């Protein structure tokens, strides 16, 4: 039983109450009494509104299901369907024109373009690594990944391979020639870098000296001007450093003593309380809030063991240079942090209201993550986050403008409880639900003075696409979904609406995740598509990926690209509403088996770690042993696709069960080296994780909007209770 403290009409889990009063509040200037009194009023007033919004979701879904059921066997009538969506209030009239009014936004969001990390804040080591991923070694990112081929004797091996190292150096020099070209000659032929009279001087191997073609790209240096340790350059708004140390192992092999190129990489990071974590009770939530507190106070630390040595990882300090004019120049040493709260769906028993009901988790997150952020606003920190006095909160999984307006209201109420100026709390709107996509302009308008981010999350969005049209017929295979008409229109619409509502210079327009952290050569080739599509940020799965994705923002001037895109014909809502139905379902038995096995394996690989180990985001080997980043969004697609095929008779429940059992053996094998792993086979009936995976598919049509959280949370609590955790 959870030990509770009565606070007014609230029953608060003691572990949360003690954390808030003893750790979160001291140093904020907020009194415990006023906080809890204010929190209770917010909960009493807004929890019923939250509940009503969820009821509306269910009502609209029931009406859409009924419409499709009444037309079973008939060809889809797109015009009648659109008229029906308008009639039931799903598709609203377009909002009148407006411009976002957000103020006090940091440059990393408003005026720069670069990669964005998303990490589970429940994991302190991941959180620290991401915070410190503002700057990343290009040499390490190239040497350690498949960007540099192993052909011609360039294998990674255990020790340093000079053949491979030389390929890395050549790649980096080519980057320097592209991003910071010399007035004459090439960085390839540089023999030294020095600073004279406030300018960068580059000596070449032919004995001549030259400078930068654009002298203004040189900003600053570290060390002695005649023999600097680092030279700071800027291109397309992003910084990078040529690091020089002729005595270092790499510098010794370089004619100019260059040991590395340090890239400004993850400009921003989302510290995630949502899809990448497994938090089901007060104990779990306190782990999340405590790590967020450490980030906001600048004192988060973690013991890390590497290569037999143990050290303490902390948040990096700012970077200090001597500017070209001789004055001191300081650059932010860390990624600018957002915090992603949970959406409106789930409740959590960390707090019970005056009626004994669990309180919506999104309201709890809003109160506690904002309270904690005050430490960073008022200077009670050694590591400043926002320099403009803002708190950046990503709000996921909102359905339509009423829900965005509810978030705006919640944030206003939280500001009042905490004594913060209006619109201190900024909002990032995830465009990952169909009703938000088709009403995106109105959603932004509902939070127009807070909005700092819109982002397409195509994974969740695909899950909602399938569930919304569950009764319309069988959908295409998962791999074919990306080439369906709706998805291109959805991606373009996000950029079109963002630019039309004045987000440029005030907010990020973002794109989704590269989900294959080991396939960096493919990412380098393909992910340039995101800045070319007008996104001034896009998600990456690791600090290394952030360093490499930064190269794309040197190749593409995103803000110039946005100016071009603003002139195109906006995406069509009719295209967005095109349901991804399979034109026919005469797949071969082998094709069906492969699709079912692939999805079943992904579901099990993710769910078993979620339920048994409380891991909400992990690199899960797929059926071909390719590591894929999985979180609840990928689980939502896989489970909904199988539920859809089951609903329309493409597959039987027996096929699902048989595939899950076979794939459980595969997943067990893939996890055999993990000493804490509990095999699912052969005791399937008594294995909580296996039963959770099965339930997600066979009961998939009944899950609210296809979300996986209700099943996962219930089953994780069952596992914890069963094992005394």
From Swiss-Prot:
- Annotated pathway, please? Carbohydrate metabolism; glyoxylate cycle; (S)-malate from isocitrate: step 2/2
Task: Please tell me where Mg(2+) binds in this chain.
Answer: 432, 460
The catalytic activity, as recorded, is:
glyoxylate + acetyl-CoA + H2O = (S)-malate + CoA + H(+)
- UniProt modified residues of type Cysteine sulfenic acid (-SOH): 617
- Active site: residue positions: 340, 631
User: What molecular function does GO assign, one term?
Assistant: malate synthase activity
BP GO annotations: glyoxylate catabolic process; glyoxylate cycle; tricarboxylic acid cycle
Could you tell me where this protein is found in the cell? Cytoplasm
**InterPro entries recorded:** Malate_synth_C_sf, Malate_synth_sf, Malate_synthase_TIM, Malate_synthG, MS_C, MS_N, MS_N_TIM-barrel_dom, MSG_insertion
Give the E.C. number(s): 2.3.3.9
Which chain regions cross the lipid bilayer? none
Question: Keywords assigned by UniProt?
Answer: Cytoplasm, Glyoxylate bypass, Magnesium, Metal-binding, Oxidation, Transferase, Tricarboxylic acid cycle
Question: Gene Ontology cellular component?
Answer: cytosol
* Required cofactor names: Mg(2+)
* Enzyme class name: transferase
Q: Where does acetyl-CoA bind?
A: 118, 125-126, 276, 313, 541
Binding positions (glyoxylate)? 340, 432, 457-460
Q: Note the subunit structure.
A: Monomer.
Q: Which family does it belong to?
A: Belongs to the malate synthase family. GlcB subfamily.
Function, in words:
Involved in the glycolate utilization. Catalyzes the condensation and subsequent hydrolysis of acetyl-coenzyme A (acetyl-CoA) and glyoxylate to form malate and CoA.
- The identity of this protein, by name, is Malate synthase G
Encoding gene per record: glcB
